[in-house]
């Protein structure tokens, strides 16, 4: 999956308990990708809780952009989410597509 997306640094399968289940990295992100995903996991839980509280439907995807990178978080089920980290100038559309197309495969890998 990473090789197919320009500017990709990592893809991780995470539990909502903020524990990385699996992770693949390539290249040098310039920061600790796993720590970033773990810390964002707490924020993601709060966003999910808020969405449920206001009745806005089920959370599907979150994109977090910083001056140096982007992280796409894709909800897989009630227990897991996938995080795709890429450079700011990486191919965001292709990364989103890859996560969406492989979501079922990722869920099956932990079931």
What are these regions, as identified by a protein language model?
Residues 1-111:
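Non-catalytic interaction/Regulatory regions outside core domains
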């Amino acid at each position: 999956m990473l090789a197919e997306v320009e500017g990709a640094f990592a893809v991780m399968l995470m539990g909502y308990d903020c524990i990385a289940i699996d992770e693949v990295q390539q290249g040098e992100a310039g920061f600790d990708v796993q720590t970033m995903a773990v810390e964002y996991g707490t924020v993601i839980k709060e966003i999910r809780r808020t969405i449920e509280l206001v009745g806005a439907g089920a959370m599907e995807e979150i994109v977090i952009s910083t001056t140096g990178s982007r992280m796409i978080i894709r909800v897989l089920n009630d227990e897991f989410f996938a995080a795709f980290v890429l450079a700011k100038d990486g191919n965001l559309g292709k990364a989103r597509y890859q996560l969406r197309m492989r979501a079922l495969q990722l869920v099956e890998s932990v079931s």
